[in-house]
Amino acid sequence: MLTGLFFGSFNPMHIGHLALANYLTEYTPIRQLWFVPSPLNPLKNTQELLPYDLRCELIEQAIRKDIRFQVLRIEELLPSPHYTIRTLRALSMLYPHHRFALLIGADNWQSFDRWKDHHRLMAKYELIIYPRFGYEVNDTTLPTGCRYIHDAPRIEISSTQIRTSILEGKDLRYWLPLPESQDVIASALQSCLSPKR
Protein backbone atom coordinates (compact mmCIF):
# COMPACT_ATOMS: atom_id res chain seq x y z
CA MET A 1 0.00 0.00 0.00
CA LEU A 2 1.29 3.45 -0.92
CA THR A 3 1.29 6.06 1.86
CA GLY A 4 1.47 9.71 0.89
CA LEU A 5 3.43 12.12 3.06
CA PHE A 6 2.09 15.67 3.07
CA PHE A 7 4.68 17.93 4.69
CA GLY A 8 3.94 21.55 5.54
CA SER A 9 3.55 24.21 8.17
CA PHE A 10 -0.27 23.95 8.11
CA ASN A 11 -0.33 27.42 9.63
CA PRO A 12 -3.30 26.85 9.76
CA MET A 13 -4.72 23.92 7.80
CA HIS A 14 -7.44 25.02 5.37
CA ILE A 15 -9.94 23.44 2.97
CA GLY A 16 -7.39 23.46 0.13
CA HIS A 17 -5.19 21.03 2.07
CA LEU A 18 -8.14 18.70 2.66
CA ALA A 19 -9.43 18.87 -0.91
CA LEU A 20 -5.98 17.88 -2.19
CA ALA A 21 -5.65 15.08 0.39
CA ASN A 22 -9.09 13.76 -0.57
CA TYR A 23 -8.22 13.85 -4.27
CA LEU A 24 -4.93 12.01 -3.73
CA THR A 25 -6.56 9.12 -1.86
CA GLU A 26 -9.35 8.77 -4.43
CA TYR A 27 -7.57 9.36 -7.76
CA THR A 28 -4.02 8.08 -7.22
CA PRO A 29 -2.56 4.84 -5.80
CA ILE A 30 -2.24 6.52 -2.38
CA ARG A 31 -4.54 4.83 0.12
CA GLN A 32 -3.29 6.49 3.30
CA LEU A 33 -2.13 10.06 3.67
CA TRP A 34 -0.09 11.26 6.60
CA PHE A 35 0.15 14.96 7.41
CA VAL A 36 3.63 15.83 8.68
CA PRO A 37 3.57 19.30 10.27
CA SER A 38 6.92 21.07 10.47
CA PRO A 39 7.73 22.54 13.90
CA LEU A 40 9.75 25.30 12.26
CA ASN A 41 10.36 26.29 8.66
CA PRO A 42 13.53 28.36 8.26
CA LEU A 43 12.16 29.82 5.02
CA LYS A 44 9.03 31.27 6.60
CA ASN A 45 8.20 34.12 8.97
CA THR A 46 8.22 32.55 12.42
CA GLN A 47 6.56 35.56 14.05
CA GLU A 48 3.18 34.42 12.72
CA LEU A 49 3.83 30.72 13.27
CA LEU A 50 1.04 29.26 15.37
CA PRO A 51 2.21 26.97 18.18
CA TYR A 52 3.12 23.51 16.91
CA ASP A 53 0.74 21.73 19.30
CA LEU A 54 -2.16 23.91 18.16
CA ARG A 55 -1.43 23.30 14.47
CA CYS A 56 -1.31 19.54 15.09
CA GLU A 57 -4.53 19.62 17.15
CA LEU A 58 -6.37 21.54 14.42
CA ILE A 59 -5.33 18.94 11.84
CA GLU A 60 -6.28 16.07 14.16
CA GLN A 61 -9.73 17.58 14.76
CA ALA A 62 -10.28 18.18 11.04
CA ILE A 63 -9.45 14.59 10.02
CA ARG A 64 -10.61 12.64 13.08
CA LYS A 65 -13.50 10.91 11.27
CA ASP A 66 -11.50 9.88 8.19
CA ILE A 67 -9.47 6.69 8.56
CA ARG A 68 -7.45 7.49 5.42
CA PHE A 69 -5.68 10.35 7.18
CA GLN A 70 -3.48 10.77 10.22
CA VAL A 71 -1.06 13.29 11.71
CA LEU A 72 2.57 12.38 12.32
CA ARG A 73 4.39 14.54 14.84
CA ILE A 74 7.73 12.95 14.06
CA GLU A 75 9.62 16.15 13.25
CA GLU A 76 9.30 17.42 16.81
CA LEU A 77 11.30 14.34 17.87
CA LEU A 78 14.08 14.82 15.32
CA PRO A 79 17.00 17.24 15.63
CA SER A 80 16.95 20.50 13.70
CA PRO A 81 17.24 21.40 10.92
CA HIS A 82 14.29 19.35 9.68
CA TYR A 83 15.45 18.09 6.31
CA THR A 84 12.92 16.00 4.43
CA ILE A 85 15.48 13.26 3.76
CA ARG A 86 16.14 12.82 7.49
CA THR A 87 12.45 12.58 8.26
CA LEU A 88 11.90 10.05 5.48
CA ARG A 89 14.81 7.91 6.68
CA ALA A 90 13.34 7.90 10.19
CA LEU A 91 9.90 6.96 8.84
CA SER A 92 11.38 4.18 6.70
CA MET A 93 13.04 2.73 9.81
CA LEU A 94 9.87 3.04 11.91
CA TYR A 95 7.57 1.69 9.18
CA PRO A 96 9.70 -0.72 7.11
CA HIS A 97 6.69 -2.32 5.41
CA HIS A 98 5.29 0.95 4.07
CA ARG A 99 5.95 2.39 0.62
CA PHE A 100 6.11 6.17 0.87
CA ALA A 101 5.37 8.84 -1.71
CA LEU A 102 6.44 12.41 -1.07
CA LEU A 103 3.89 15.03 -2.09
CA ILE A 104 5.26 18.34 -3.26
CA GLY A 105 3.74 21.37 -4.90
CA ALA A 106 4.83 22.53 -8.34
CA ASP A 107 6.35 25.58 -6.62
CA ASN A 108 8.65 23.35 -4.54
CA TRP A 109 9.46 21.19 -7.57
CA GLN A 110 11.03 24.26 -9.21
CA SER A 111 13.66 24.39 -6.44
CA PHE A 112 13.82 20.68 -5.67
CA ASP A 113 17.39 20.42 -6.96
CA ARG A 114 18.45 22.59 -3.99
CA TRP A 115 16.93 20.27 -1.38
CA LYS A 116 19.36 18.33 0.78
CA ASP A 117 20.14 14.96 -0.82
CA HIS A 118 17.46 15.44 -3.48
CA HIS A 119 19.00 12.67 -5.63
CA ARG A 120 18.59 10.19 -2.78
CA LEU A 121 15.00 11.30 -2.25
CA MET A 122 14.20 10.63 -5.91
CA ALA A 123 16.05 7.31 -5.92
CA LYS A 124 14.26 5.91 -2.87
CA TYR A 125 10.80 7.52 -2.83
CA GLU A 126 8.11 8.23 -5.36
CA LEU A 127 7.43 11.94 -5.85
CA ILE A 128 3.93 13.14 -6.62
CA ILE A 129 3.83 16.74 -7.75
CA TYR A 130 0.58 18.64 -7.46
CA PRO A 131 -0.28 21.82 -9.38
CA ARG A 132 0.12 25.33 -7.98
CA PHE A 133 -1.03 28.50 -9.71
CA GLY A 134 1.83 30.27 -11.47
CA TYR A 135 4.06 27.19 -11.74
CA GLU A 136 4.29 24.95 -14.78
CA VAL A 137 5.58 21.38 -14.77
CA ASN A 138 6.59 19.65 -17.99
CA ASP A 139 5.71 16.07 -17.18
CA THR A 140 7.45 14.78 -20.32
CA THR A 141 10.82 15.67 -18.76
CA LEU A 142 10.19 14.35 -15.25
CA PRO A 143 12.67 11.76 -13.94
CA THR A 144 11.58 8.18 -13.32
CA GLY A 145 9.61 7.92 -10.09
CA CYS A 146 8.15 11.43 -10.39
CA ARG A 147 4.57 12.03 -11.40
CA TYR A 148 2.64 15.22 -12.02
CA ILE A 149 -1.09 15.07 -11.27
CA HIS A 150 -2.69 17.62 -13.61
CA ASP A 151 -6.24 17.24 -12.41
CA ALA A 152 -5.73 17.78 -8.69
CA PRO A 153 -7.93 20.57 -7.33
CA ARG A 154 -6.37 24.02 -7.08
CA ILE A 155 -8.07 25.97 -4.35
CA GLU A 156 -6.22 29.24 -4.28
CA ILE A 157 -6.34 29.84 -0.55
CA SER A 158 -3.17 30.38 1.41
CA SER A 159 -2.52 30.07 5.11
CA THR A 160 -0.88 33.51 4.95
CA GLN A 161 -4.07 35.03 3.55
CA ILE A 162 -6.10 33.29 6.25
CA ARG A 163 -3.89 34.62 9.06
CA THR A 164 -3.98 38.17 7.70
CA SER A 165 -7.74 38.08 7.18
CA ILE A 166 -8.43 36.65 10.64
CA LEU A 167 -6.35 39.42 12.21
CA GLU A 168 -8.43 41.93 10.19
CA GLY A 169 -11.59 40.44 11.71
CA LYS A 170 -12.91 38.84 8.52
CA ASP A 171 -15.30 35.87 8.71
CA LEU A 172 -13.54 32.87 7.11
CA ARG A 173 -15.71 30.08 8.47
CA TYR A 174 -15.92 28.33 5.07
CA TRP A 175 -12.17 28.46 4.48
CA LEU A 176 -11.35 26.41 7.55
CA PRO A 177 -12.21 22.73 8.10
CA LEU A 178 -13.54 23.66 11.55
CA PRO A 179 -15.34 27.01 11.45
CA GLU A 180 -15.21 27.26 15.24
CA SER A 181 -11.39 27.23 15.10
CA GLN A 182 -11.28 30.81 13.79
CA ASP A 183 -11.48 32.30 17.30
CA VAL A 184 -8.77 29.94 18.58
CA ILE A 185 -6.51 30.89 15.67
CA ALA A 186 -7.17 34.61 16.20
CA SER A 187 -6.26 34.37 19.86
CA ALA A 188 -3.08 32.38 19.13
CA LEU A 189 -2.02 34.85 16.43
CA GLN A 190 -2.49 37.79 18.78
CA SER A 191 -0.29 36.01 21.33
CA CYS A 192 2.37 35.35 18.67
CA LEU A 193 2.39 38.98 17.58
CA SER A 194 2.24 40.63 21.00
CA PRO A 195 5.60 42.00 22.20
CA LYS A 196 7.49 39.52 24.34
CA ARG A 197 8.72 40.80 27.72
UniProtKB/Swiss-Prot annotation:
EC number, as in UniProt: 2.7.7.18
Gene3D superfamilies: HUPs
Keyword field contains Nucleotide-binding: yes
Highest rank taxon of the organism: Bacteria
Catalytic activity: nicotinate beta-D-ribonucleotide + ATP + H(+) = deamido-NAD(+) + diphosphate
Keyword Transmembrane recorded: no
Function according to Swiss-Prot or TrEMBL: Catalyzes the reversible adenylation of nicotinate mononucleotide (NaMN) to nicotinic acid adenine dinucleotide (NaAD).
Protein name in UniProt: Probable nicotinate-nucleotide adenylyltransferase
Protein species of origin: Porphyromonas gingivalis (strain ATCC 33277 / DSM 20709 / CIP 103683 / JCM 12257 / NCTC 11834 / 2561)
Organism lineage string: Bacteria, Pseudomonadati, Bacteroidota, Bacteroidia, Bacteroidales
Gene: nadD
